[in-house]
Amino acid sequence: MAPNTQANGSQVSAHLATPDGDSGNSSHDRFDLFSLRWAAGDRWWHRSNYTGAFLFNTAAFILPALYSTLVKIWIAKIDSSLVVTTDVYTYINTIAEVINDGLPRAVWVTIADTEARSLKARLGLAHSLMVFQALLGLLMSVIFVAAAQQFASAFVPRDVRAASITYIRVSAFSALSSAIEVAVSNATRALDKPDIPLLISSFKVAINIALDLLIISTFHVGNWNPDINIQAGIRLTCDMAAAISGLFYFLFTVSFRRSADAPTLQGFIVLLKPGSITFIESALRNALYLWLVSGVVSMSADYATAWGVFSTIRWGLIMVPVQAAEATTLTFVGHAWGLFKQRPYPPRWSWASLCGTIYLRPR
């Protein structure tokens, strides 16, 4: 739909068909949107092609899901009653998802719009997003630390509540790492660079697994007795290191080479208009989910543990391909939406016109 002109050797010229169906191009230049050429054509493995981007995104999402399963196994070896405590990390990130579904989801109609803005301006929006998300994530982390007792009373069973306070306070700063990671990941996907989110996930999971094997696994080095708080510290360290590494990799390989715009208040306002809609939707959706979770937790530790295991399986088996398809599709729809908005035709568009054609004119 929005192929990379450098990678594919073609120039996107005429975009969607006019409302009256007159394309103005010869039939051999026509590229039907319902054709699979945009997904499996030349260089299908490339990150600027839908199939290639989908593979990158699938790998990026599946690695954290795999690690979440391993964590539960290792914690069960330490103390099976504390497996439910590891779900605190999930619930903190669920609350953080509210801010991660705000401005970061606005990238698909702003940063992904290749027609309305230059690459320099799109990079400036990405920088504004990253700065604002980092500030919001830091604020949310401080709130979690201050309200650790109240958080435990809502999302941790009574039997292990006292033993989970430190775990909550350590895991609180995962809201900051999550905010940075999501901002970088969404912005780079909108810029047709899904390899950067994959780099972040690969680095995070690889270091996490290596340190967990060395420190908290059943065959760890040393003579100490590992506990759940050590695991929380390892996970937080790796999350922060991966998020910051991905940020600096993006800045040094893309932003500095392109002399991109600096973060601005105007960039924040551009993102705020579409982002406020997704923010409200996410707040309502996640509030209902957390209300359901608190009800399950209040029933018993067994129910809470079972719910956590079910959620881990669900995110691993079902939601990974769904998230990968969503992120990839939103990127390419954002590109096409930018093309669509540049059409000079003011009348209302019919459904047939919206399912129009794209034209590729060889160089």
For the regions a protein language model found, what residue spans apply to each?
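Membrane-interface helix-loop junctions in multi-pass transport and translocation proteins
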Residues: 195, 205-244, 363
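Small-residue-rich hydrophobic transmembrane alpha-helices
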Residues: 76, 83-138, 181-190, 307-363
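Transmembrane helical elements of multi-pass membrane transporters/channels
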Residues: 52-71, 170, 204, 234-246, ...
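Signature of the first transmembrane helix
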Residues: 22-35, 48-108, 276-298
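Alpha-helical transmembrane segments of multi-pass membrane proteins
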Residues: 146, 158-184, 363
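Short runs within selected transmembrane alpha-helices of multi-pass transporters and secretion channels
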Residues: 104-108, 170-190, 197-205, 231-247
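Helix-loop interface residues and adjacent transmembrane-helix termini in multi-pass membrane transporters
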Residues: 77-80, 190-191, 218, 225, ...
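Interhelical loop/hinge segments that connect adjacent transmembrane helices in multipass membrane
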Residues: 7-54, 228-286, 294
